[in-house]
A protein has these predicted regions:
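Hydrophobic alpha-helical
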Residues: 1-12, 86-87, 101-172
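Flexible loop/hinge segments that line or gate small-molecule binding clefts
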Residues: 2-39, 57-65, 166-174, 178-179
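Solvent-exposed loop/turn segments at secondary-structure junctions
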Residues: 18-22, 38-39, 74-78, 105-110, ...
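Hydrophobic alpha-helical segments within soluble ligand-binding/sensing domains
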Residues: 32-64, 113-114, 165-169, 185-204
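Short, solvent-exposed amphipathic alpha-helices that sit
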Residues: 40-44, 78-97, 112, 116, ...
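Hinge/cleft segment of the Venus flytrap/periplasmic-binding protein
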Residues: 64-75, 79, 191-240
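Short beta-strand elements in bilobed, periplasmic/extracellular small-molecule ligand-binding domains
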Residues: 67-70, 91-110
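Exported/periplasmic ABC-transporter solute-binding proteins
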Residues: 144-187, 191-217
Length: 240
């Protein structure tokens, strides 16, 4: 696509799935609008760290170590790799001791998330302190498996975090079954794409003044993720 756009001298804007840096470097009129996947992982780690700092009783083994399970997206997918890596890095950066009990792919899918969580519960049971999922659909699936195992009733609880702030996930936040999620702000990304494309169509060089967004390295507009919890869900989503 980049080669064809370059040959036709047509500016090209990619959205939400970042091309490789070497592809972005092929031409000076290629742009990307999106969010940094590592930031979403960092925010998941922050949500969990805040929870365990406030709830020391949440360590099921009473050893001060967060024993977690990870349900990941598509193997090799950049978002899955970065969210997985940086959620754990953020926990450690917050001073948390962590141990991975198990990790498996749920392929971004709710049913597969439920299946993987059921398998984790069968093997590890109450040893699990936290569930980290690369997206909300898998987190909601994990919650279904936890409900079937008696969690979220009679004080039995495991914190679950996801990414995307989907409508069903926000309902789970309000229900108290999902601890937190991270918003990939589609509205702001759409505005950035429109502003950028408009400037390019006029033959101008994009900058913060004419797009309203910082242009990093002359090619990238990064729209920050936002932490969403039960406490701020209505406000954050009202701004979407």
């Amino acid at each position: 696509i980049i080669d064809k756009a370059k040959a036709a001298n047509i500016p090209l804007v990619f959205l939400n799935r970042e091309p490789l840096k070497e592809d972005m470097a092929k031409w000076d009129k290629v742009y990307y609008v999106g969010a940094k996947a590592e930031q979403s992982g960092e925010m998941q780690g922050k949500i969990l760290a805040d929870y365990f700092k406030k709830h020391p009783e949440a360590y099921h083994s009473n050893d001060g170590v967060i024993h977690y399970v990870m349900i990941t997206g598509e193997p090799g997918h950049q978002d899955a790799v970065l969210r997985t890596e940086h959620s754990v890095k953020a926990l450690k950066a917050e001073g948390m001791k962590v141990e991975e009990l198990a990790s498996d792919t749920g392929m971004w899918d709710r049913v597969k998330g439920q299946e993987k969580m059921a398998a984790f519960l069968s093997r590890y049971g109450d040893k699990i302190d936290a569930v980290i999922c690369n997206n909300d659909d898998m987190a909601l699936g994990a919650i279904e498996a936890l409900k079937a195992a008696g969690y979220f009733t009679n004080g039995k609880y495991i914190p679950v975090v996801g990414v995307d702030a989907t409508t069903p996930a926000v309902q789970a936040l309000k229900d108290g079954t999902l601890l937190g999620t991270v918003l990939n702000n589609a509205k702001k990304q759409g505005q950035a794409v429109f502003n950028l494309s408009y400037v390019l169509a006029k033959g101008e060089t994009p900058n913060k003044d004419n797009t309203g967004f910082d242009i990093v390295d002359g090619k990238y507009i990064w729209v920050p993720y936002e932490i969403v919890t039960k406490e701020n869900a209505d406000k954050i989503l009202g701004d979407k």
